[in-house]
Amino acid sequence: MLFLPQGLRSGVVQALVSEPPDLVALRGASPGAMFDRGIEALGGMGRFVKPGQTVVVKPNISFDLPEEMGANTNPAVVEHVIRHCMNAGARRVYVIDHAIERWESSLERSGIGAAIRASGGIHVPSNEERFYRRVSLNGATLTSTQVHEALLENDVLITVPVLKHHGGTGVTIAIKNLMGCVWDRREYHRIGLHQSIADFLHVKKPVLSVVDAHRVITRHGPRGGSPDDVVMMNSQIISPDPVAADAASAMMLNREPSDIGHIRLASEAGFGEIDLTKLNIERISL
């Protein structure tokens, strides 16, 4: 089985069509190689990033832990995303995340700092309130929040989460990853966590969601506690639809997408498709 239950496999695999798939699900190669093949299947990064544009890449860099613990996005995925953006003609590629633990150490210990430098990206600090601006948005619950200025000042957003269990929301994937773009995350908890996560898409919807499912924390997330919490899935989900990316990824953790509040609410608000049977999905084994 590649990511989806048997009943969803017929009728959604890419057939003889000229249009790129809605979602690509990959397994069996290194994280960087999977992204290279997946973005090719989607029509190339030039479909999402135009020459001269500036890009914000948002991975998970929240935890002061090494790559092997699965708490942060695999650095090879981040590096390859940035390289493809640069090759598509991006003027600059910025990387942001409001880290939960010490940001300097999290950046370097995760390997993402080295990946950014190797690929020509620019890391922008997120640890001080002066980097954020308050904006109003048309959310059901979240109507105002402080957003990282990099997100507001640049053209394209790409969310690059690592798939994980989360004790508060069930899962953390592409949509919830964007909580790392705001200053006061406690505000979400005060006014309604799942609705606020979905509402944030009114600020800026990512053009691409790249879900790293190489090492996956399946319990005690989002940080994990030991190597026993991590399962090697050696997989990746890529889609221009963040709801579809989250729906497919949630099923990898044996969760029904409609049972995850923020995924369902984002779908109901029109930000993407939660019903995978309606999508053209290409599965690639490498």
Name every feature range the model reports, one short phrase each.
Residues 1-286:
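N-terminal and secondary-structure boundary signal
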